[in-house]
């Protein structure tokens, strides 16, 4: 496995973990604005897409 593959995978996992943490934080805050929930939902989606793309790139590189 190349260094670039490990690097891409690490970034993907970090992005996913960060977005999940943001989503959980907004869910536990009762007075959070709806816009904040929507933004964190987009972050979560970006993390999932990033992980998928990173995984695909790891096979291609």
Swiss-Prot record:
The keyword Signal belongs to this UniProt entry's keyword annotation: yes
Induction: By multistress. Expression is controlled by the MSN2 and MSN4 transcriptional regulators.
Keywords: Glycoprotein, Signal, Stress response
Biological-process GO terms, alphabetical: cellular response to heat; cellular response to hydrogen peroxide; cellular response to starvation; DNA damage response
Signal sequence segment: 1-22
Coiled-coil intervals, chain numbering: none
Family statement drawn from the similarity comment of this UniProt entry: To yeast HOR7.
Something else known: Present with 784 molecules/cell in log phase SD medium.
Protein name from the UniProt record: Protein DDR2
Biological classification of the source: Eukaryota, Fungi, Dikarya, Ascomycota, Saccharomycotina
Gene name tied to this protein: DDR2
